[in-house]
Amino acid sequence: MADPEELQVSSPPPPPPSSPSSSDASAASSPGGPVSLGWPVPSRSSGPTVDQLEEVELQIGDAAFSLTKLLEATSAVSAQVEELAFKCTENARFLKTWRDLLKEGYDSLKPDD
């Protein structure tokens, strides 16, 4: 995720103090006052916001790790299911062949009419 400093760099720069817009007239009249441009400008009290961003990033990282582990486990189970299906198919083929042989043997022991 983007670093908070990168977010500040990517936001549009404020206009020069010499040309304030009409909505900035009251803020520009006090020297050194903040200039409101209609988008959120991080203030010095942005510490909790940065902490919240870091917490969200950690939660996303934890979720991604958990999802990766879940994918690995699902892949392993999927491979086991495929192997089991193959073995079941082999067993079914064997049982069918065995049944056919038993039937032939039984039929060969019957007296001819």
Curated annotation (Swiss-Prot):
Which Pfam families does this one have?
Answer: RCDG1
Which stretches does UniProt call biased (Low complexity)? Answer: 20-31
The entry's localization annotation reads: Cytoplasm
Q: Which domain of life is it from?
A: Eukaryota
Q: Name one GO cellular component term.
A: cytosol
Ranges for region Disordered: 1-50
Q: Where is the signal peptide?
A: none
Query: Which key words are in the record?
Result: Cytoplasm
State which tissues express it.
Expressed in the kidney, in epithelial cells in both proximal tubules and distal convoluted tubules.
The protein's predominant localisation is: cytoplasm
Classification via PANTHER family:
RENAL CANCER DIFFERENTIATION GENE 1 PROTEIN (PTHR31641:SF2)
Q: What is this protein called?
A: Renal cancer differentiation gene 1 protein
Q: Which organism is it from?
A: Homo sapiens
The organism's lineage is: Eukaryota, Metazoa, Chordata, Craniata, Vertebrata
